[in-house]
Structure formats: structure tokens, C-alpha cells
């Protein structure tokens, strides 16, 4: 069956073969069409931008305690300063409405404790993975692990250790002339994090494709209220 839809000089005709034709009876109808077309194009571009924009947040664990030298390094807890710094970063995440779809956490106690503090404020990730292999991993081991994560996850929070976090950001990013990179490259302090964006189709394409967008240290933020 044929179908015709008309509105104020603008009509759409569809024949039995599903062929569409557009008619404009006056200039205003053409303007309406052009506006709708441009709006759709902007919407389509925005959707495509989001589809291929991936975000990786690389965070170093908060400050840990050295009081008990008999404790194995893997089991060292956070000290008071570390807990306060992790809380400040959590408040920053909450204020900026950051959401992480996948959390990849070293299973050392200080990294797990850092994530536990963050979890009190941020939305729960769709998937959280604790990995002992991250504890002594270099940046290439972590990259290979990230590459295996499904492209359905567009944002990843990684909490790990130095010097791996710094080396990872160095390797993945290409805008090394920025102040953010220079700060990060000078020192990646405890509880600091780097935000990296990738214009890619999947995590298997991340090598040297990232743009460092933020590098935030606890001392850059206002003190939390106790």
C-alpha cells in the first residue's frame, strides 16, 4: 500500500516498494527538513563519538603503613594519611560523577583497601576483578590483561603499584608535552590517578593511542572534613 504523511507543506510519500520521496511546498518546509537533518547528524556523530571513546583511570594505591616490619609487603595496610587521601579522591570522583564499568585491582591489601574506600562513594562497577598477578606486574603484563577486556566496557579503573603505574601511562599516551604528563612523569604519588582517553574500537587497540586528560594528586584537592 502507498502511504503519505503531510504537515504544513512538507510531505513524505512511501510506495508499495518501500521507496521514500520527500516534497516541499514552500521554503519553510525545506528549512524544517534541513534542521531535522542537521540535528540527526549531530546526534549520530555524538553517538559514534561515545561508541569509540574509551577511558582508563590509572590509580596508585593510597599511602601504606611501615609500622610493623614483620608484616609481609603484600599484606601492608593503609596508614591514616593513606585513608584520608583515598577519601579525598573518592569525593572528587563523586563530585565529577565518575562511573567505572570495570575495576581491575591488585589483590595486595593496600590496593584492595584503597578500592574499598572509593566504593563507599562511587557507583558499583559492573565487574570487579582482583588479581594477584598485578602485584609485581610490569606495564606490558597489564596492557595484555586490559586488551582481553570486552569492548562492552567503556571505562576501566585500575589500581596498582609504582613504578608500573607511571610506566603504563608513559607507554599508553602520546601527548607527552602537556603539564599533566610532566607532573606525572616527575612523580606519581600515592592515591594519585591519571585519566586517559582512547579513540578506539576496542581495548585491544590501546597501545600508544591514549591522550592523558587529567593527572590528579591528593594534595591538589581540598582537605576532606572529618
Give the label of every model feature segment:
Residues 56, 154-157, 193:
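Residue-level preference for the first positions of well-ordered beta-strands
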Residues 1-29, 33, 37-42:
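Low-acidity, Ser/Thr- and Arg-rich intrinsically disordered low-complexity segments
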Residues 133-171:
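Internal catalytic or translocation cores that form aromatic/hydrophobic pockets or channels
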Residues 173, 177-211, 215:
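Domain-level recognition of soluble alpha/beta enzyme cores
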Residues 74-76, 120-122, 147-148, 173-177:
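Glycine-rich, phosphate-binding/catalytic loops in enzymes
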Residues 54-55, 59-137, 188:
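Active-site-proximal alpha-helix that buttresses catalytic centers in soluble enzyme cores
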Residues 100-121, 127, 197-226:
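Conserved histidine-centered catalytic loops in small-molecule metabolism enzymes
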Amino acid at each position: 500500500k502507498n502511504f503519505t504523511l503531510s504537515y504544513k507543506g512538507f510531505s513524505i510519500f512511501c510506495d508499495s516498494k518501500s521507496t521514500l520521496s520527500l516534497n516541499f511546498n514552500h521554503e519553510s518546509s525545506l528549512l524544517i527538513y534541513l534542521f531535522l537533518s542537521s540535528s540527526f547528524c549531530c546526534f549520530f556523530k555524538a553517538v559514534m563519538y561515545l561508541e569509540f571513546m574509551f577511558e582508563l583511570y590509572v590509580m596508585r594505591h593510597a599511602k601504606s603503613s611501615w609500622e610493623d616490619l614483620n608484616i609481609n609487603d603484600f599484606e601492608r595496610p593503609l596508614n591514616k594519611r593513606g585513608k584520608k587521601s583515598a577519601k579525598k579522591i573518592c569525593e572528587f570522583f563523586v563530585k565529577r560523577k565518575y562511573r567505572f564499568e570495570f575495576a581491575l585491582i591488585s589483590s595486595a591489601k593496600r590496593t584492595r583497601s584503597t578500592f574499598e574506600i572509593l566504593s563507599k562513594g562511587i557507583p558499583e562497577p559492573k565487574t570487579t576483578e582482583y588479581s594477584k598477578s598485578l602485584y609485581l606486574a610490569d606495564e606490558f603484563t597489564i596492557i595484555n590483561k586490559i586488551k582481553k577486556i570486552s569492548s562492552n566496557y567503556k571505562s576501566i579503573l585500575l589500581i596498582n603499584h609504582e613504578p608500573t603505574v607511571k610506566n603504563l601511562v608513559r607507554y599508553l599516551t602520546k601527548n607527552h608535552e602537556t603539564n599533566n604528563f610532566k607532573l606525572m612523569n616527575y612523580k606519581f604519588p600515592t592515591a594519585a590517578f591519571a585519566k586517559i582517553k582512547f579513540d578506539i574500537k576496542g581495548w585491544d587497540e590501546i597501545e600508544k593511542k591514549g591522550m592523558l586528560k587529567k593527572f590528579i594528586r591528593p594534595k591538589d584537592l581540598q582537605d576532606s572534613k572529618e
